[in-house]
């Protein structure tokens, strides 16, 4: 299981962006991230075509299956979920379709119940909710 955002475990810096200007102002080793909204598909395409490492954050409690697969066509490093049920569903899709993107659940890393749910559900990894400013 991947563990991102823990103070004792080194990981890349996640930078929330809203447009290509945000990409240009980020460092080369940053992972840019943005909301999984259809209006951001062009941003995902830009990242894919230009070799920019990016992640997509699914903020909704109801994942739109088409949105999930459309974003995955552009090969994000991570798909990050704040809703555990959506993370579990996405992990099933990622496993069944052999997607390259890793599924992460955004959580309080001190929440032992969430750790158990993620482990039992075989979620690819977790990310500290403090690493990202999720709405």
Cite the ranges covered by each PLM segment.
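Conserved N-terminal beta1-alpha1 strand-loop-helix module at the mouth
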Residues: 1-77
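Short, surface-exposed beta-strand/loop "edge" segments at domain boundaries and coil↔beta transitions
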Residues: 24, 41-42, 113, 133-135
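Catalytic cores of alpha/beta
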Residues: 66-68, 84-94, 110-124, 128, ...
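N-terminal donor/sugar-recognition subdomains of glycan-related enzymes
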Residues: 19, 130-131
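Glycine-rich beta-to-alpha transition loops that act as phosphate-gripper elements at the mouths
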Residues: 35-38, 58-62, 78-84, 103-112, ...
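Glycine-enriched alpha-helix->loop->beta-strand junction motifs that scaffold or abut catalytic
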Residues: 49-54, 68-77, 93-105, 120-126
